[in-house]
């Protein structure tokens, strides 16, 4: 029945790792031919790969794991997807119904554990309810505010035989997302937009999740309102869009953060006012009225009070707003001049060097070489300084181009997510930017990438540190580098070769250029160990608890 449900849902790829309680599912997987099963080397990686597949494709990602430690290994993947509203369905095996509650071998209360980090979960209690549950799981995962759904199936139920009657419609009276925005609220929002002197578009991952980027681009082009993007919203507007200031937040640009501080109207689309964006709440956008459009009513006024809340799907709401939106062009001209001065005062840049490789240079040079290749590129990251440098310096030009863990900040996410993205976008060049700390957390997935013949390029910005933690220690902990020095390291290039891939060590700019071009041409999963400046900082930086306009702009001497 699981196989038939996946066929009905159009699933073409599943990521997973087998075990005793999931053997019936895997036996049926062996017999079918309509989806590909990708055997990862760890259950956490299976869920991250399903997550990366979902982000890159816009489809629901699917993963299989077994009970007990198989499931607990998957929890970080669920929490990562939940934090970023990523649609996926995790199907876990469970001990037989008669053994539940007996502390049986590899028994764990999976639904109890998953409850805080999924949109919904199920413990299947009979074969008769399995088709309905699977239908609901996919519907819940992709509808409204997307998210992961967990389905736990005892082994006796996967062994049972029954009639497969897949529902043609969903009957969930207590779950009915609101898609069409309130007309009166939309009218009020349009009125305040017309009156605004310093309006600002605040764009987040919800725009990507709703596949509403084209409408946002039309809205931006029609109004000319300056815009900022969150980490999860990068690519909603193209990098070169004249209205886009850049990323906002803890490591956002000076101009973007000052715009958020001085705006008199925030038009918030698909965002949740995360602490990394707001900074000190009492100082956040003190002069601004807020229009907040989101399909999830629980996100509105949760952190920052919305003066004009609109619950609805961005596609429906923006279609209505586009017809009637008007702005005061004279006000906008003055506002743009103010923002241009901020950008000129502290542009997002870095001091390059001919003596040592700067990590920002690596990001920009990678973008340049990828563009010259003429192929589409998908960029994955792990979590740390490299993630922020990619966000700051990679010129994203479309949604779903950046695959990164935003809300949970999961180290070890990048490589398996890149494997998932490559399965979703096999014709695209997939590059994973990682650090010498993050890469070791799921490095076994080099084997997965090699086995399935879908190469991923991994660029390690190697500074012999847990770089972001080291940066905090530099600024806020008296330069006491407790447990962040990673000077003792493995040979990453040889590890890559041991997994059947290609390995490169890059100590100069020329070596990096040559290695990246060779990696793109060799047809193997590759690792580029790029030795970068050890003490380079990600700047600007808003200290924890500080106002968003209170930025550190220079490294400590």
What do the PLM-derived regions correspond to, one by one?
Residues 91, 99-100, 105-106, 300-303, ...:
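Thiamine diphosphate
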């Amino acid at each position: 029945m699981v196989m038939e449900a996946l066929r009905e849902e159009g699933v073409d790829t599943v990521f997973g790792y087998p075990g005793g309680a999931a053997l019936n599912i895997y036996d049926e997987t062996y017999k079918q031919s309509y989806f590909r099963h990708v055997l990862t080397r760890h259950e956490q990686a299976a869920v991250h790969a399903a997550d990366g597949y979902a982000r890159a494709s816009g489809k629901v990602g699917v993963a299989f794991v077994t009970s007990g430690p198989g499931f607990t290994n998957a929890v970080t993947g669920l929490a990562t997807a939940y934090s970023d509203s990523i649609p996926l369905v995790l199907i876990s095996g469970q001990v037989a119904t008669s053994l539940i509650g007996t502390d049986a071998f590899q028994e764990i209360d999976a639904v109890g554990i998953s409850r805080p980090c999924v949109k919904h979960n199920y413990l299947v209690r009979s074969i008769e309810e399995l088709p309905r549950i699977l239908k609901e799981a996919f519907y819940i995962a992709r509808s409204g505010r997307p998210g992961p759904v967990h389905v736990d199936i005892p082994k006796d139920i996967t062994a049972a035989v029954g009639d497969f009657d897949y529902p043609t419609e969903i009957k969930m009276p207590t779950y009915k997302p609101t898609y069409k925005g309130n007309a009166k609220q939309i009218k009020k929002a349009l009125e305040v937009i017309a009156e605004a002197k310093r309006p600002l578009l605040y764009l987040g991952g919800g725009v990507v999740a709703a596949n509403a980027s084209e409408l946002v681009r039309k809205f931006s082009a029609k109004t000319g309102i300056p815009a900022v993007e969150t980490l999860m919203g990068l690519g909603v507007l193209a990098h070169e869009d004249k209205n886009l200031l850049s990323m906002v937040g803890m490591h956002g640009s000076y101009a973007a953060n000052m715009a958020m501080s001085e705006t008199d109207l925030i038009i918030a689309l698909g965002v949740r006012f995360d602490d990394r964006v707001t900074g000190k709440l009492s100082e956040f956008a003190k002069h601004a009225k807020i229009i907040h459009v989101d399909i999830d009513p629980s996100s509105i006024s949760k952190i920052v009070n919305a003066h004009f809340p609109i619950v609805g799907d961005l596609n429906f709401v923006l279609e209505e707003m586009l017809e009637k939106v008007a702005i005061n062009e004279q006000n906008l001209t003055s506002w743009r001049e103010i923002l241009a001065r901020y950008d000129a005062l502290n542009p997002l840049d870095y001091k390059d060097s001919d003596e040592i490789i700067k990590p920002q240079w690596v990001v920009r040079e990678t973008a340049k070489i990828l563009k010259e290749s003429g192929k589409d590129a998908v960029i994955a990251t792990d979590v740390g300084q490299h993630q922020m440098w990619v966000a700051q310096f990679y010129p994203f030009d479309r949604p779903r181009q950046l695959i990164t863990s935003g809300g949970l900040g999961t180290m070890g996410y990048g490589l398996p997510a890149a494997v998932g993205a490559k399965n979703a976008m096999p014709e695209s060049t997939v590059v994973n930017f990682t650090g010498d700390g993050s890469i070791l957390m799921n490095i076994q997935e080099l084997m997965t990438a090699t086995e399935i013949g879908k190469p991923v390029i991994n660029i390690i910005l190697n500074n012999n540190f847990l770089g972001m933690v080291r940066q905090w220690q530099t600024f806020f902990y008296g330069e006491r580098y407790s447990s962040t020095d990673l000077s003792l390291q493995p040979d990453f290039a040889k590890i890559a070769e041991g997994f059947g891939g290609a390995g490169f060590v890059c100590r100069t700019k020329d070596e990096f250029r040559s290695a990246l071009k060779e990696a793109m041409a060799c047809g193997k999963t590759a690792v580029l160990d790029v030795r970068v400046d050890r003490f380079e900082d990600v700047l600007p930086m808003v200290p924890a608890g500080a106002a968003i306009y209170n930025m550190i702009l220079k490294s400590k001497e």
